[in-house]
């Protein structure tokens, strides 16, 4: 019946207010990457908490530091590495502080407790509410999806002054690997 609505194929260079141009698997991957970004770009402990891993204590609820600035978690490094690699490619992780922030310490994950990226200047909740992120599809094939995250910021960042919104565009790329879709280039409005 021609009166039934049908999904139209995603159009390159079209701007979207959501990620509807991605498949369900790709949207879930993006969500997982976004959730992981708070630890990958922010403080590593954020990711460990999100994934339910606990700090190893010395029995008195004190958190011992190992080496300089690292805390030990109750997960094997192999398990953690497998989980992070189910989201990101090595290429993507190499462009972050991953190798410095998360270390293999006698088979467990040691996390640098204070290393993090600064938030992008002008990142405010008010701007995000008034000007939510949008996306521009660049390429969508069976092997690769590229799109642009269009982020909005306030030049002044002050509540007292009127908004002076500016835009930064960030590339995002997903690639099909032998193990499924992975994020190969990733950015967020919060960390750039």
Q: PLM features: residue spans?
A:
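Intrinsically disordered, low-complexity repeat and linker tracts
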Residues: 1-21, 189-192
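Compositionally biased, intrinsically disordered/low-complexity regions enriched for serine, proline
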Residues: 2, 6-9, 61, 129, ...
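Intrinsically disordered, low-complexity segments enriched in proline/serine/threonine
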Residues: 7, 11-14, 66, 134, ...
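Core segments of small alpha/beta cavity-forming domains
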Residues: 15-119
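Intrinsic-disorder/low-complexity regions
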Residues: 17, 116, 139, 183-184
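Surface-exposed, charged secondary-structure patches
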Residues: 105-156
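Short beta-strand edge/turn micro-motifs at domain boundaries
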Residues: 148, 165-192
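Short, cysteine-centered beta-strand-loop-beta hairpins and adjacent loop/turn segments enriched
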Residues: 152-166
């Amino acid at each position: 019946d021609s009166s039934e609505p049908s999904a139209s194929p995603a159009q390159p260079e079209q701007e979207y207010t959501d990620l509807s141009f991605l498949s369900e698997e790709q949207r879930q991957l993006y969500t997982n990457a976004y959730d992981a970004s708070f630890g990958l770009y922010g403080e590593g402990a954020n990711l460990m908490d999100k994934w339910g891993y606990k700090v190893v204590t010395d029995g008195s609820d004190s958190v011992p530091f190992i080496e300089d600035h690292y805390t030990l978690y109750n997960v094997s490094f192999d398990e953690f590495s497998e989980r992070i690699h189910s989201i990101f490619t090595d290429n993507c992780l190499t462009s972050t502080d991953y190798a410095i922030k998360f270390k293999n310490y006698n088979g467990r994950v040691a996390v640098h407790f204070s290393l993090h990226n600064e938030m992008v200047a002008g990142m405010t909740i008010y701007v995000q509410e008034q000007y939510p992120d949008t996306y521009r599809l660049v390429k969508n094939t069976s092997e690769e999806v590229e799109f642009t995250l269009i982020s909005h910021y306030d030049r002044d960042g002050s509540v007292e002054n009127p908004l002076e919104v500016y835009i930064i565009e960030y590339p995002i790329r997903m690639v099909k690997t032998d193990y499924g879709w992975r994020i190969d280039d990733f950015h967020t409005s919060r960390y750039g």
